[in-house]
Amino acid sequence: MQRREFFQHFLKRAGIGAGALGAATAGLVGYYQPRKEVFDTSGKNNDELAEKLTTPKKAVVIGGGLAGISSALELARRNFEVTLVEASPSLGGKLTGWSIEALGEQFPVEHGFHGFFDQYYNLNEMFASAGIGSDMFTASPGYPVIFSDRQVEVFGQTPKWFPFNILSVVQQSKRLDIMSFLKDYPGLWPVISMFRYQYDRTFRDWDSIDFMTYCRRGEVLPAFIDTVLHPFSDATMNRMEVLSAAEAMRYFHFYFMGSPEGLAFRIITKDCMSALIEPLERKMTSLGVRVLKGRKAQNLVMQDGRVTAVRLDGAGAANGEVASIPKREVPVTGWLQHMSDAGIPVLVARRGASWVALDGRCTHMGCPVAPEVSTGGFHCPCHDGRFNAEGLPVSGPPKAPLPRLDVREAGEMLVIGQASSSSSPVVVTAEELPCDYCVVASGVRGTRELIALTRPGNSGFAGQVAALGEADPYVVWRVWLDRPLPSADFPFYTVSGYTYTDSITFYSSFQQPFIDWAKRTGGCVVELHAYAVAPQDVRPEPEIRATMLQELHAMFPESKNATIRHEIFMMQSNFTRWAPGDHAKRPGVETPYANLFLAGDWVSTKAPVFLMEAAVFTGRMAANAISAKESLRQKPLPIVPMNGIFA
């Protein structure tokens, strides 16, 4: 659409005609607005179909994050016999949490701060269904952005009505002004184009380039990039320089430009586990869902193009070799770190004339562990878990040891396989879960491993899953300081222009038990979050912490006088990658296998959803697809408008 056509289209849609200024204003403000819609793929007779099965069928859901929980809840309500399998000892995925001992007390911790936006329609519905009320949330007082080279910009709760929402953002900015924004005609067009989001066209035209290139080619006003687009797009957990321009447009459409809800979001007054995940787990069990925590799905059992069972890890569950490694690669002392073709990290060492091998996945969340020279054991940087040289947990959230693997010599090679009951110090009996339907709702890494070990016959599907990627690693550094930081007026800040810090959260200002601890001790609890660390900035932990501390001092100078009484540093990589070109290879909810479905924020869907809402939405989509197979009523799913207001 050319500029002239666009303005003709705009005037027509807005109701603007010659000599009709009043009607134009009414048309613009009244009719031409984003409105909540419904994503409905059911047929015309959907309401006439039964809601539940008369005879239960078995469904296995793999993954206990938001996608798996939402799918399990919907299937259980339809009278399916649901088993949910989660490798971690707790549910929640990226919302999971655990307790630590610090300063003589127990504190809950998690992966980092989460804001809950009003347009998370499906997520909020799921919370409400589990009895999670408004008392667990408080409204954020604003959306402040700290810049490295100028004053803080505070974006308050913006109006929900277009064009006042975007004009409000510009008006609230100290750096931007309406006239300079409107005068920058060449750079205004690509911004307006972001209001033209339309799934097919947007991904056809813009998925081949990154968002920064899109902005620079379009000559977007640099001040608008620095003040609005860059800090907000970083929250995708993908750097603007490697984020697909099409995905960025979907993101901004969902969160702001196409949302009927403005910038409003809520924060929780308790930790994620007690406020959200535990009530959801109780709701699942009340509906009859069997929840298996600490059990890993090893592979799917396939027969005649269907999944007949899900095989869980355990003694006797071997499914061929895990890895084959030349003996010469194993060092004389220390451990060899090896990544198998299926993406499984393996640790191998010499023990005299014999060999020992461990599964290198942390038993907390499956992140790769690394040998720690100072202790002789292993460290998981994701959640600061530690294991001794035998693989037994010694600190942090992991409770189970690293699984022992079998090692067999074959000439000059070592063949690494799943442990037999005689070689593993901890024996877990293998189990096969028969199923009529299966939903894979794991994260990217877990799904890749599962499908690789399943070895499905459809190479196209296997290739799609294998191509899934994770974003650059992110860092969460939470510190307990011995004094408050009085200049912190907000509980949460977005940050722009620093090497690492992308946001900073003051937990002691809004969440228990940190509020009480701060009152008793006179201190504060602060969390610095780096959303996506560029490859050139991935450095040893002490260097990153030192730099982030300097950034804290720059943002809040009074912190220079504070002493860190306790700290937790986590660095991990488990958020979905949204790189240029990824979209075309991304698998959808339905697969080439009649009873196998996928769910997660990484799953392709035409609906304008993102992050947590995408996880819950695709979980519900999977349940709807299964319902269609059984001629059951499908649930219409609320969404923001499918298209931008200028589409």
Swiss-Prot record:
The keyword Iron applies. It comes from Chlorobaculum tepidum (strain ATCC 49652 / DSM 12025 / NBRC 103806 / TLS). Its EC number is 1.3.99.39. Keywords: 2Fe-2S, FAD, Flavoprotein, Iron, Iron-sulfur, Metal-binding, Oxidoreductase. Pathway: Carotenoid biosynthesis. FAD binds at A67, E86, A87, K94, Y120, D601, M612. It comes from the Bacteria. InterPro entries: Amino_oxidase (IPR002937), FAD/NAD-bd_sf (IPR036188), Rieske_2Fe-2S (IPR017941), Rieske_2Fe-2S_sf (IPR036922), Zeta_carotene_desat/Oxidored (IPR050464). One of its GO terms (molecular function) is oxidoreductase activity. Disruption phenotype: Mutant lacks chlorobactene and all its derivatives, and accumulates only gamma-carotene and its derivatives. The growth rate of the mutant shows no significant deviation from the wild-type growth rate at any light intensity. This is Carotenoid phi-ring synthase. The lineage of its organism: Bacteria, Pseudomonadati, Chlorobiota, Chlorobiia, Chlorobiales. Gene3D superfamilies: 3.90.660.50, FAD/NAD(P)-binding domain, Rieske [2Fe-2S] iron-sulphur domain. It catalyses: a carotenoid beta-end derivative + 2 A = a carotenoid phi-end derivative + 2 AH2.
